[in-house]
Amino acid sequence: MKKLFGLLFLLPFIGTAQDCKLIRETDPFTKETKISTGFIFVNGGSLTIDADKKEVVVLFSINNTGRCFDNNSTAIIIFDGLKSKTSARNGGTMNCEGLFQFVFKNSASTTTILQRLMTYKIASIVFTDSNKKESTLTVAPADQDVILKLATCLINESKTLL
């Protein structure tokens, strides 16, 4: 009887674990595992979250080609249900392909921005490029749920790579 209650208690966790559809790749040379959400398409561009044992990278691809981003470019994330905005700088290299990155060290503790990605839905993100021009990614409610679920799965799974 106790075992039955134990199994019933674990059932919700097993059900949600099966919803994580992450892409898992192993580098043939280094034998290191990398996990990814794959690209999630939103209004104005797309995003993907990747992780290996060293870092977690959130990569945004903005549709407006010709947008140049450097280390002084910024992004302001507006979360649903949160009054304050989150601001971050580009962690990637200078490019004019419309690519913007947040780069975080993969560690046992989760940084504030990653924690917010796991707990709040993204309403929109405003990117300011190297020419001080703004581009906005707007996230539809259905996409908000997908991003929240995949971000939570990937960030939790990234801890197993350490």
Where are these regions (language model features)?
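Residue-level recognition of well-ordered beta-strand positions that form the cores
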Residues: 59-61, 76-78, 126
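Mid-length scaffold segments of soluble, non-membrane domains
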Residues: 65-87
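Bacterial Sec-dependent N-terminal signal peptides
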Residues: 1-23
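Internal interaction segment
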Residues: 83-162
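Residue-level signal for mature regions of secreted extracellular proteins and peptides
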Residues: 10-13, 60-62, 89, 146
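Extracellular/mature segments of secreted proteins
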Residues: 27-31, 75-78, 104, 160-162
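Generic marker of residues within folded, mature protein domains
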Residues: 7-9, 48-50, 65-67, 94, ...
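An ectodomain-focused feature that recognizes extracytoplasmic/extracellular
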Residues: 18-71
